[in-house]
Structure formats: C-alpha cells, structure tokens
C-alpha cells in the first residue's frame, strides 16, 4: 500500500510538470533548500576553500530542471546544486513534440522575438553534468547547446551559459504555432499558453490512441509502456515545428547509458 501511495504521489507530481520552483535563487544542499541572494553568495564564497560556483557549468533550466523535485530525482538527496535566477530574451518556453520517460510532455526554448522568460540556471559539477546529459537523452532526445540571450539576476562568473534543445522540435497547435507553458512566467508572449493536461489530451488526439486519457492515466501509461511511448513520439513528428535560426549553437555530445531516459 505504501508503494502504491508513493507511485500515485509521483504521478500526481508528474501531472504538475514543470513542478514548483522557489522564487529567486536557491541552494539545494543534501535535501534542504536555502535562499540564495548576492550577499549570501558572497558569504558562502568567504567560508569555503573554493567559491560556491567554482568549477561548475551553468546550464539553463527551462522546465523541470529548475525545480528541486526534479533535481532531487536526478541527483539524489546528498547532492549540492546552486540554482540562480536568469532571464532568457527573445525566446519562449514551449511544449515539445516528445513524451518523456517520466510521462510528461517536456518543454524547450523556442525563438519568440521580444519575449522574456523567467528561468533558472543550475550550476553543475562535472559528474552532475554528465548525469544530466544522460537524463536528457543527449544526442537523441536533446542536443547540448550554448545559449544566447541569457541575463543573470545575480553577479556570477563570466562565461557562456549552456542548455538543452529538443531535437524532435515543438508541438504544433491548431494555429500551426507552438504553445507555451502556463506555469513559466514570461513577458510579451506571442504564443498561447496551455497546461500539462491540455497537452496530454492533444497528444492523445493527434496519435492513434483510441481514447483521450486523463493526464494521470496518460502519464502512468507512458512511464510503463516504452514501446507505445516511442510509437507516439514517431507519430508526433508530423505535428512538429523546428525553430528557424535559433539563438543557440549545438555542441556535439554522445554518450552511452541513455536508453533508460528515452
């Protein structure tokens, strides 16, 4: 019964993609959350041998990777992950033409002139970055990219910011335009926004599923039936839009061990 409750709780959380994230910057440290502002960052720097962000790679998190729940799921309860606030200019965050291994319809950045999205940057050490590559299905589901148009909200080390871009493209709606995530704050949006339940229903209608499932039923089935999930992803390609001249540069990465994340 406990396992069933846990599975249901996870399903409910997955239906709430991209999950709750604290306002502002924060530090996830061994399962606990701490607010992180400029003064805190400077104080942390003074009491450590190395600065908090030293040796870490800044990775823009446009969806679930900005949330403590997902970071805990990916890195475990002993992980230390600094997360800083950022704005992404001239892009919106929209739903992909993809179904993730955890059952949600994930998101990706997409060019949108004048739009400013409120996002996070996760600062990953070398091992965390390699594991993040795996969980993103690097080279198959997502490309690793160097982003443009990122504005930090704290003073952080100068250098490029990286991220992930969906290789399958983004899901087209009735107007042949993408649909943004209602849960992600943005200014001057050009695209309509929808919630995860609406996206799951659209995927059901666009593919060969015989009925429109509830979002919980959709997620549970996608988590457990990989062959069906792969079939749906293939069918969604006829409804996918690829970005034209995106503001990022692909960095070729290939690695083994990604099958369980596809």
Model-derived features with residue positions:
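Single conserved hydrophobic/aromatic residue that forms the stacking wall/gate
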Residues: 1-12
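Short, contiguous, well-structured surface segments enriched in hydrophobic/aromatic residues
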Residues: 13-35, 88-105
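A short acidic-Thr-Gly-centered motif at the start of a beta-strand
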Residues: 45-55
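Short His-Asn-centered micro-motif
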Residues: 61-64, 124
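Short Gly/aromatic-enriched secondary-structure transition segments
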Residues: 72-83
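A structural-propensity feature for long, helix-poor, extended segments
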Residues: 95-122
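Acidic, glycine-rich loop-and-strand cores that form catalytic or ligand-binding grooves
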Residues: 121-146
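Mixed-charge (acidic/basic) macromolecular-recognition segments
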Residues: 158-254
């Amino acid at each position: 019964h406990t396992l069933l409750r846990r599975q249901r709780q996870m399903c409910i959380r997955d239906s709430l993609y991209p999950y709750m994230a604290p306002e502002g910057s924060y530090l996830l440290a061994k399962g606990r959350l701490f607010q992180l502002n400029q003064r805190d960052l400077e104080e942390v720097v003074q009491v450590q041998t190395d600065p908090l962000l030293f040796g870490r790679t800044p990775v823009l998190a446009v969806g679930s990777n900005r949330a403590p729940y997902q970071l805990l799921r990916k890195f475990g309860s002993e992980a230390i992950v600094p997360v800083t606030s950022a704005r992404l200019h001239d892009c919106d965050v929209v739903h992909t033409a993809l179904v993730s291994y955890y059952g949600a319809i994930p998101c990706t950045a997409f060019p949108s002139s004048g739009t400013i999205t409120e996002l996070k940057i996760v600062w990953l050490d070398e091992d965390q970055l390699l594991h993040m590559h795996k969980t993103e299905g690097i080279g198959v589901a997502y490309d690793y990219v160097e982003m443009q148009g990122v504005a930090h909200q704290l003073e952080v080390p100068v250098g490029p910011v990286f991220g992930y871009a969906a290789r399958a493209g983004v899901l087209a709606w009735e107007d042949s335009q993408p649909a943004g995530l209602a849960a992600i704050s943005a200014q001057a949006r050009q695209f309509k926004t929808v919630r995860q339940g609406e996206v799951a229903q659209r995927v059901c209608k666009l593919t060969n599923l015989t009925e429109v499932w509830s979002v919980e039923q959709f997620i549970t089935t996608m988590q457990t039936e990989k062959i069906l999930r792969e079939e749906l992803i293939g069918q969604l390609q006829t409804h996918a839009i690829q970005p034209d001249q995106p503001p990022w540069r692909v960095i070729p990465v290939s690695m083994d061990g990604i099958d369980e994340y596809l």
